[in-house]
A protein has these predicted regions:
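N-terminal accessory scaffold of Fe(II)-dependent oxygenases
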Residues: 2-272, 279-364
Length: 364
């Protein structure tokens, strides 16, 4: 006998209840960096973990990370960097236009010297600026990314890898990024397909975290993409991307659904967060005493576990059948020529997130 939508919805509610029966309600905490074996166990548990006592800086490096002068000294005044510019601090988000239509809006990208950027940032007025290039701007190992990373000058002070994470994963970080902003910049809910090690150098970062299971409660829809441009009056406004422009799946709401129990993590200077792959997160920040909120993060490829992959797709199909239109259809696009999981499977049967996603498209 076919199940009606109300029965399927009840099963989904039971799924969340069963999850909460066993899921720890807050982030795990480690008072010192894990060994590679402990890190492997941490990854296997796939639960956010706050780590204290770790530093991504090279041994013997001593800098005052709260002040702009440090970044100008390391990068040089003349070399320009790519800066995301918005009017509301939401670099990647869904907006409702005057016509009532919604669109996924990317920031205007402007190039400016590190000195100009930091001067405008610490003035804390006008438009919101964020250094968030996220394509491995310090280090990168992603095939197809050409040229030297934009912030390669920071390699003299930032380690190439998190040693215990590298040894646990058996691979080097696919991307290492520097993020510089202030309290005006925030993110909407999104998830990244990479194991993430995130360290705060200056200020405070506040993460609102939802597990992949809780992600079934989010309203995610495909949106036509737009990019902020300057109008004739100099004001920023979204402009639709030229064709062919592929719709972007994104969550519009900045507030967690009522039925979920988000984990809130507040990272202070010197704290590190291990954020498992595919956990949804919204990030807010506060600048430190020098007017800056700064972090370094490492993305590691995540092995796709067959049972988790299959069960999550099954849950998505159930959610769609129950009428949850905000859950993406896992079977959409399966008839095109983009290939399937067999196309990215290694000879040992393993599949990693590195085979399916480009880090430059994630994590803003």
């Amino acid at each position: 006998m076919a199940l009606n939508k109300s029965t399927l919805e009840a099963h989904l509610e039971d799924l969340i209840t069963d999850y909460y029966d066993l899921q720890f309600p807050s982030a795990f905490k480690l008072n010192e960096p894990p060994s590679p074996l402990e890190a492997l166990r941490m990854i296997s548990k796939s639960h956010p973990t706050v780590i204290r006592g770790y530093s991504p800086l090279r041994e013997g490096v001593s800098r005052e990370w709260r002040v702009p002068a440090t970044y100008i000294e390391l990068h040089g005044n003349g070399t320009e960097v790519a800066i995301a510019v918005t009017d509301d601090g939401l670099a990647d988000s869904v907006r409702t236009l005057g016509s009532g239509e919604t669109t996924f809006v990317k920031p205007l990208e402007e190039r400016m010297s590190m000195t100009t950027f930091l001067s405008k940032l610490t003035a804390n007025g006008g438009e919101a600026l964020y250094l968030q290039s996220q394509d491995g701007n310090i280090y990168r190992s992603q095939p197809g990314m050409r040229g030297e990373p934009e912030l390669a000058s920071f390699q003299q002070v930032v380690e190439r890898d998190v040693a215990w994470m590298r040894d646990a994963m058996g691979s080097t970080a696919v991307a290492v990024n520097l993020w510089i902003g202030n309290s005006r910049s925030t993110t909407s809910f999104h998830h990244d397909p990479y194991e993430n090690v995130y360290h705060v150098l200056s200020g405070v970062k506040r993460f609102t975290l939802l597990s992949p299971v809780e992600g079934l409660c989010l309203e995610q829809h495909f949106q036509p993409p737009s990019t902020l441009v300057r109008g004739v009056d100099g004001e920023l406004q979204p402009e639709r991307d030229p064709e062919p422009a592929h719709p972007v799946p994104w969550v519009q709401s900045l507030v967690p659904p009522r039925e979920v129990r988000p984990i809130i993590v507040e990272l202070e200077e010197g704290d590190t967060l291990y954020l498992p792959a595919d956990w949804w997160h919204k990030v807010e920040q506060e600048e430190g005493s020098g007017g800056l909120a700064v972090a370094v993060n490492y993305w590691y490829t995540s092995e796709l576990r067959p049972e988790r992959y299959a069960l999550l797709r099954f849950a998505q199909r159930v959610a769609r059948s129950a009428g949850r239109e905000g859950v993406l259809d896992p079977d959409a696009g399966m008839d095109d020529d983009s290939g399937d999981i067999d196309d990215v499977m290694f000879s040992d049967g393993s599949v990693t997130s590195d085979d399916e996603w480009d880090p430059s498209e994630w994590g803003r």
